[in-house]
Amino acid sequence: MPTVNQLIRKPRQPKPVRNKVPALKGCPQRRGVCTRVYTTTPKKPNSALRKVAKVRLTTGIEAVCYIPGEGHNLQEHSVVLIRGGRVKDLPGVRYHILRGVLDTQGVKDRKQRRSLYGAKRPK
């Protein structure tokens, strides 16, 4: 605990604000090209094969992005749009791929929360 004199000499420094999505460079979304599409396993209490893609963005940065929803059509050289938003049980995955935009198809037969998965309204 500093003394009053020490605080007068050198005041407290505010904590620097850390950017949670540096690859987006302040933009809401960014376009990129898939360089690798693969599956990975989550952290300890959970168990699954999560679908992720390594994406080279227009900013030149490579980011690991999660592919939400059941089934996808992504492969190498697919052009995708990414947004911020981490996946809690996948370390290093800080971005989501937007479904139903550019080369990514929407989730088939999706009835609820369709806008998040790029699914059209069922007839």
From Swiss-Prot:
UniProt entry tagged with the keyword Transmembrane helix: no
Family matches, as Pfam families: Ribosom_S12_S23 (PF00164)
Gene3D superfamilies, sorted: Nucleic acid-binding proteins
Any one Gene Ontology molecular-function term assigned to this protein's record: tRNA binding
Residues recorded with modification 3-methylthioaspartic acid: D89
RNA-binding keyword on record: yes
InterPro entries: NA-bd_OB-fold, Ribosomal_uS12, Ribosomal_uS12_bac
GO BP term (any one): translation
Keywords: Methylation, Ribonucleoprotein, Ribosomal protein, RNA-binding, rRNA-binding, tRNA-binding
GO cellular component, one term: small ribosomal subunit
Complex formation: Part of the 30S ribosomal subunit. Contacts proteins S8 and S17. May interact with IF1 in the 30S initiation complex.
PANTHER family tied to this protein: 30S RIBOSOMAL PROTEIN S12 FAMILY MEMBER
Function: With S4 and S5 plays an important role in translational accuracy. Interacts with and stabilizes bases of the 16S rRNA that are involved in tRNA selection in the A site and with the mRNA backbone. Located at the interface of the 30S and 50S subunits, it traverses the body of the 30S subunit contacting proteins on the other side and probably holding the rRNA structure together. The combined cluster of proteins S8, S12 and S17 appears to hold together the shoulder and platform of the 30S subunit.
Protein family: Belongs to the universal ribosomal protein uS12 family.
Name of the protein described by the UniProt record: Small ribosomal subunit protein uS12
Species for this entry: Caulobacter sp. (strain K31)
Gene that this polypeptide is encoded by: rpsL
